[in-house]
Amino acid sequence: GSEMCIRDRQEDSELLDEVVVIGYGQVKKGDVTGSLLTVKPDELNKGKQLTAEDALVGKVAGVNIVPGNGAPGSGGTIRIRMGASLSADNDPLIVIDGVPVSNTSISAINPNDIASFTVLKDASATAIYGSRAANGVIIITTKKGSADGTSRPSFNYNGNMTVSNVYQYMDVLSTEEFRQAFAEHANAPETFKLGNADVDWQKEIYRVALGTDHNLSMTGALKNMPYRVSVGYTNQNGTLKNNNYERINASVGLSPKFFDKHLSVDINVKGSIENNQPVSTGVIGSAISFDPTRPVYEDYEGNVGLGYYTWMNSGKPITLAAANPVADLELADKLEKTKRSIGNIALDYKVHGLEDLRFNLNMGYDIQKNDNRENVPDLAPSMYTGNQNDGTGKRYKYHQTKRNTLLDFYANYDKELKDHHINVMGGYGWQRFWYKNNSVTTDTEGKELATPQHAEAELYLLSFYGRVNYSWK
């Protein structure tokens, strides 16, 4: 027999009428001509989200988040359709509340502040941003306050605690198996005779890592001015000892309207402070290959090795041998401190008497400061490298400042005439990119060990852009 299927099209119609964010404006989903996908908060990944990238993993076809080195706060590399170049930059353009930002890290954005991701994939969708969008565009819209008729603030808190550990160590010889293998090659020189210890070096470098994440937001309205204020605190230990990541986030959003709602204003300010204590991932390889019959700690004449076992030959450290991985973890003092603020003020004016025409002005900034340091004391095992400064410790400092500013002004005309709908947009954009960095490496007494580095650059981007959309029912 035959079957008749009757479908209710109401839901599909509602989806087509849904408004989505695109470059320099919003359109109904049914009028979109390019390839884009919007991911909303209830569609994002749940549970632990240390960075904004975590919320997007596996949610958009063709978007891959390539994991970092596994350390807390390392984030991931975003690729849309896996990029297009073997040698050039494959990073997509990231736009946060109308402000294009660097894709080096979007950790300045608290995942709990994100209202939606819009991913623009193909040329027709990304063309409005020019050549810098050749690898796609990700538009991040943050949460706003809502004028729901009440001035009472509402509070929201969420937090979590995590426990992480290494599920399985690399399979290596036990101390007994190592001794048996060594006995089969008993002609080894005296320098490499076995020790008397029994050390599992992987257990010495790993730990059970604890993490906490707390987020508090307040939403409300003051005399019909919606606002949202949020703060967040994240502290995550790495499974490698001495590895830690700490982040403090804060954001403020105001959305007042004036002149009988003809002028809409959006003010967004976001800030973050990140303190990252990285460790060398090379200690993992050292722990796998290090002699399990050697102790973690041992004293030598002249305090060589600072109390940690060090490979020695005739009373001198062997420069070509792997350094004690525990010493590398505990003696290297590393800190990467990042302060960042992203903000903008956007004006949307609906012309009196000609309300199909709107003028938009967006002024924004992205300011970032990085201060990195690495201190290793004299006589540390890793400082014996066979050069003229053998055993000399080091002091490394790096400072970078970035200041990016922008101004966008565009007009948007949107008109519906019976079955016809036309949207015309045209505008002008100005951006300034400036950065300065310097670094210096000295010994523990301040003597330079390398030539100090300094760089400074200033770039400008001027653009004229436009778009015409026409649809007929």
What annotation goes with each model-predicted range?
Residues 2-272, 279-280, 342-343, 449, ...:
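Short, small/polar-rich motifs associated with maturation and membrane association
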Residues 362, 465-473:
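Exposed, low-structure sequence patches enriched in small/polar residues
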Residues 144, 221-224, 258-260, 349-353, ...:
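Outer-membrane beta-barrel strand-turn architecture
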Residues 147-198, 239-243, 249-342, 360-463:
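Surface-exposed loop/interface segments of Gram-negative outer-membrane beta-barrel transport/assembly proteins
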Residues 357:
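Surface-exposed interaction regions that form or flank ligand-binding interfaces
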Residues 28-29, 64, 432-442, 469:
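Proline-centered turn/helix-capping motifs that create local helix->coil transitions or kinks
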